[in-house]
C-alpha cells in the first residue's frame, strides 16, 4: 500500500491520443520514473491517469507537461467531467477515408467474381493510396513516431509499418516495373487496412462511451435550472447561480437540485439512482431530500444545504470516476503482455518474411505474409479486456446502491468465501423496542404510571434504551412529569426525584433491587431488562429487544445459496447473539467481543485461508473492517467506518452486500472471458497470417473486430440480473 505524506497530492488527468494499452504503459512508465511521482496509473479504456506526487517538488502543470512530451494531449480532469469526451475529428476523416475505399472495395469484389476490369488503373490506385498514406494516415504515423521516441512501441507502429511497407513496395513496382505493375501492386491493401482499423477505432470509442454511461446518467440527474425564492418571488435561475441556504421549489416531474431539508409541502421522491431503492419514498416537512431525486408526486419546498460536488450525488460521481480510473490487480497480466507484445510481433513478422522467402523464393508472398502478421496483431483487445469490464461492473454496482472504492476492491470481493456481520444495525434495525412488561401482582401503580415514571427519568439521558422508553410513553400519548435529576451511575442506571412520588431509579434489576421472577428469565436471555423502583421498592420492569430487519433472513439465505460462510460477531450478550443466529440459520456466532476481539477473530479466519468480507456499522467496527480482506460500511455509518471500508452500501441492507458479491463475481468472470478471447484471437490469428491464410485486408478487419468484440462482451454485464 502506498504511504501518503502530508505533501502528497492526488490528481486525475484526462489523456487524449492513446491508441492501445502500450500507450498507457508508456505514459505510466515515464511518470513513475520521476522522483517526485509516488504512484501513477493509466487506464486506457477510461483514457485517464491517476497520479500521486509530492506537491512540494512538482506542480500539476509539470505533470501535464511530462505527458505532453511523451506525445499525448492531457488536462486536469474537472469535477463531474466525463472520462471520454467526444472526438469530432474522427467522423470526417473516416468519411473521406471510406469514400476512397469504395473503388478499391468494388475492385476487390470484382476480382472475387473473376473480373479484373473493375480495378482502377495502377496510377489511380497510387494517387488515392498516396492521399491515404500522406494525409489520412498521419495520426498513425504521429502515434508511431511518438511511441518510438518514448522508447516503446504500440499498435500505431504495427499498422504504419505494415501499410507503409506495402505502399512503398507497390510504388516501386509501379514506377520501376510498369509493364508488370497491374499484377504486382497492392495499394488496395494499404488503403483498406487503414480504413478497417480506423473504422474499428471509431466503433471502439463509441462502445467505450456506452460502457461509461453510468457516470453520464448520474450527471444528467442534476437539473439545469431551478426555481428559487428571492425577494418573495419565485424565479427560475441556472443551478450554478444557487447559493447554500436558498429556498428551492420542486414540483411533480422535476428533480431535486441540492441536498437539503424540506421547509413545507410533501410528496414522493424516486431516489433509485442514488440508493438502489426501487420504490419512491414519502417526504414531509423536516425530512431530507437528495440532489438528483425525482419528485414523482406532490410539490416540495426545501432549503439547500449542499450543492454540486458536496452533495451525495456529487460524492457518487467522484467515487465512480475515481474507481473507473483505477486498475484491478488482474490487469497487471495484460499490462505485462502488452509491454512486450509489439516488439515480439515485429520479430515474428521479420521471421515470417525470411522463412517464407527461403522456402518459396517469392518476395511478394513473403512481404504479404509479413504485413498480415503486423496488421492482425492487436494489443488493444488485451488492453481493453480488464478496464472495460471493470467500468461496466462499477457502473452496475452504483446503480444497485453499492460504491466500490476502487477496482481492486471489486476484484477482491469476487473472491470472498466468508462474510462476517455485525449484529446491531446490520442484521437488526438498531432500534430497541419494548417487547414485554412486568409488574408485581400487588402493583400499586398502573401500567401507564410505569411508563410515565420511567420516561420522566430517562428523558434526561441520551442512550438507545432511554430513547426507546421515552418514545413508547409518547406513543401512548401519556403526559410525562418533570423529574429533578439527582445522579447517574455509569453502567447501572439513573436516579431522580419526582414530586409527590419519591426517589425513582431506572436501570439494571440489581440497581433497582429487583430479583427477576422465573417468568422473566427466558426473556432475559434475548433482551435487555430495565427495572423501575420508587423509594427502593421495585414497581416493574421492561424487556427491550432489537428486532431483525425485514430482509435479513432473505439476505442470509442468498449468501448461503452462493456457498458463502456467514459469521456473526457482536459485542452483545452471547445469548442474544445466539438467538439472532438461530432465527437466521447462522451456525457461527460470537458474542461479547470487543473491537479488538473482532479484528483478531477475522485474522484467524484469514490465517485459515479464507477471503473475508466484513460488514459493519459504527466506530467500534472500524478495526474489524480494517482487518478484513474486503470491508463494507453502511452509508449511515460513522465517518471512520466509511473511510476504512472498501465499499459502501447505500440502503443499509445486507441484501446490497449480496448484490455486490454477485456483481463482483460476474465482473471477474467477464474479465477472464475477455482475456481469453483476446489471447485466443492473437494466438490463432498471428500463425494464420504468417502461413498466408489471411490477406492484409482481412487481417485489418479482424483486428478491428477483436477490440469491438471484447467491448461488446463487457457491455453484457449491464444485462446481468441478480
Swiss-Prot record:
Presence of the UniProt keyword Phosphoprotein in the record: yes
Instruction: Tell me where in this chain the HMA domain is found.
Output: 9-75
- Gene3D superfamilies the UniProt entry points to: 3.30.70.100, Calcium-transporting ATPase, cytoplasmic domain N, Calcium-transporting ATPase, cytoplasmic transduction domain A, HAD superfamily/HAD-like
Q: Which residues bind Mg(2+)?
A: 617, 621
The record's annotation in PROSITE patterns points to: ATPASE_E1_E2, HMA_1, HMA_2
The residues annotated as the active site are 422
Q: Which reaction does it catalyse?
A: ATP + H2O = ADP + phosphate + H(+)
GO biological process terms on file: copper ion homeostasis
The record's listing under Pfam families reads: E1-E2_ATPase, HMA, Hydrolase
Recorded GO MF terms = ATP binding; ATP hydrolysis activity; copper ion binding; P-type divalent copper transporter activity
Please report the name of this protein according to its UniProt entry: Probable cation-transporting ATPase HI_0290
Amino acid at each position: 500500500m502506498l504511504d501518503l505524506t502530508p505533501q502528497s497530492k492526488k490528481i486525475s488527468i484526462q489523456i487524449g491520443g492513446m491508441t492501445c494499452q502500450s500507450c498507457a504503459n508508456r505514459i505510466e512508465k515515464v511518470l513513475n520514473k520521476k522522483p517526485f511521482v509516488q504512484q501513477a496509473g493509466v487506464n486506457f479504456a477510461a483514457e485517464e491517469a491517476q497520479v500521486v506526487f509530492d506537491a512540494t517538488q512538482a506542480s500539476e502543470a509539470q505533470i501535464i507537461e511530462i505527458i505532453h512530451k511523451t506525445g499525448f494531449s492531457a488536462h486536469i480532469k474537472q469535477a463531474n467531467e466525463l472520462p471520454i469526451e467526444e472526438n469530432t475529428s474522427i467522423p470526417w476523416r473516416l468519411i473521406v477515408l471510406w469514400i476512397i475505399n469504395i473503388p478499391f472495395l468494388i475492385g476487390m469484389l470484382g476480382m472475387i467474381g473473376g473480373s479484373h476490369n473493375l480495378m482502377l488503373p495502377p496510377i489511380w490506385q497510387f494517387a488515392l493510396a498516396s492521399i491515404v498514406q500522406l494525409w489520412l494516415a498521419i495520426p498513425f504515423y504521429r502515434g508511431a513516431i511518438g511511441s518510438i521516441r518514448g522508447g516503446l512501441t504500440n499498435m500505431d507502429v504495427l499498422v504504419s509499418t505494415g501499410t507503409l511497407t506495402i505502399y512503398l513496395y507497390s510504388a516501386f513496382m509501379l514506377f520501376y516495373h510498369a509493364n508488370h505493375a497491374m499484377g504486382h501492386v497492392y495499394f488496395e491493401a494499404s488503403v483498406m487496412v487503414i480504413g478497417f482499423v480506423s473504422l474499428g477505432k471509431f466503433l471502439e470509442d463509441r462502445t467505450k462511451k456506452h460502457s461509461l454511461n453510468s457516470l453520464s446518467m448520474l450527471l444528467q440527474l442534476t437539473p439545469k435550472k431551478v426555481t428559487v425564492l428571492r425577494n418573495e418571488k419565485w424565479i427560475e435561475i441556472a443551478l450554478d447561480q444557487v447559493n447554500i441556504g436558498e429556498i428551492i421549489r420542486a414540483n411533480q416531474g422535476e428533480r431535486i437540485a441540492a441536498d437539503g431539508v424540506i421547509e413545507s409541502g410533501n410528496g414522493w421522491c424516486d431516489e433509485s439512482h442514488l440508493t438502489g431503492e426501487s420504490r419512491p419514498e414519502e417526504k414531509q416537512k423536516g425530512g431530507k431530500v437528495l440532489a438528483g431525486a425525482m419528485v414523482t408526486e406532490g410539490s416540495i419546498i426545501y432549503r439547500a444545504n449542499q450543492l454540486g460536488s458536496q452533495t451525495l450525488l456529487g460524492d457518487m460521481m467522484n467515487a465512480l470516476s475515481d474507481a473507473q480510473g483505477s486498475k484491478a490487480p488482474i490487469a497487471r497480466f495484460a499490462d505485462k503482455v502488452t509491454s512486450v507484445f509489439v516488439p515480439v510481433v515485429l520479430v515474428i513478422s521479420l521471421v515470417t518474411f525470411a522463412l517464407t522467402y527461403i522456402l518459396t523464393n517469392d518476395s511478394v508472398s513473403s512481404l504479404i505474409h509479413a504485413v498480415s502478421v503486423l496488421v492482425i496483431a492487436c494489443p488493444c483487445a488485451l488492453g481493453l479486456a480488464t478496464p472495460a469490464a471493470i467500468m461496466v461492473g462499477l457502473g452496475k454496482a452504483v446503480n444497485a446502491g453499492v460504491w466500490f472504492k476502487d477496482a481492486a476492491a471489486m476484484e477482491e470481493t469476487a473472491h470472498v468465501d466468508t462474510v462476517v456481520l455485525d449484529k446491531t444495525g446490520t442484521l437488526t434495525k438498531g432500534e430497541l423496542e419494548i417487547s414485554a412488561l412486568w409488574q408485581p401482582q400487588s402493583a400499586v401503580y398502573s401500567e401507564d404510571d410505569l411508563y410515565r415514571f420511567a420516561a420522566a427519568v430517562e428523558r434526561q439521558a441520551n442512550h438507545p434504551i432511554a430513547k426507546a422508553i421515552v418514545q413508547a410513553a409518547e406513543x401512548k400519548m401519556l403526559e410525562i412529569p418533570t423529574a429533578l435529576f439527582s445522579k447517574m451511575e455509569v453502567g447501572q442506571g439513573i436516579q431522580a426525584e419526582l414530586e409527590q412520588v419519591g426517589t425513582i431509579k431506572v436501570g439494571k434489576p440489581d440497581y433497582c433491587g429487583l430479583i427477576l421472577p422465573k417468568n422473566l428469565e427466558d426473556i432475559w436471555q434475548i433482551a435487555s431488562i430495565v427495572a423501575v423502583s420508587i423509594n427502593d421498592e421495585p414497581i416493574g420492569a421492561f424487556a427491550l429487544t432489537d428486532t431483525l430487519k425485514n430482509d435479513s433472513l432473505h439476505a442470509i439465505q442468498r449468501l448461503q445459496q452462493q456457498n458463502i460462510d456467514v459469521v456473526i460477531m457482536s459485542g452483545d450478550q452471547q445469548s442474544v447473539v445466539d438467538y439472532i443466529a438461530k432465527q437466521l440459520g447462522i451456525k457461527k456466532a460470537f458474542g461479547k467481543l470487543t473491537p479488538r476481539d473482532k479484528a483478531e477473530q477475522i485474522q484467524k479466519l484469514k490465517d485459515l485461508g479464507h477471503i473475508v468480507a466484513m460488514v459493519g456499522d459504527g466506530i467500534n467496527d472500524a478495526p474489524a473492517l480494517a482487518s478484513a480482506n474486503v470491508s463494507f460500511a453502511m452509508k449511515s455509518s460513522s465517518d471512520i467506518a466509511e473511510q476504512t471500508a472498501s465499499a459502501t452500501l447505500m440502503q443499509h441492507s445486507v441484501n446490497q452486500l449480496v448484490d455486490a458479491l454477485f456483481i463482483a463475481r460476474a465482473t471477474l468472470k467477464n474479465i477472464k472471458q475477455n482475456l481469453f478471447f483476446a489471447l485466443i484471437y492473437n494466438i490463432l490469428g498471428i500463425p494464420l497470417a504468417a502461413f498466408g491464410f489471411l490477406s492484409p485486408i482481412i487481417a485489418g478487419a479482424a483486428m478491428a473486430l477483436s477490440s469491438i468484440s471484447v467491448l461488446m462482451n463487457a457491455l453484457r454485464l449491464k444485462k446481468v440480473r441478480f
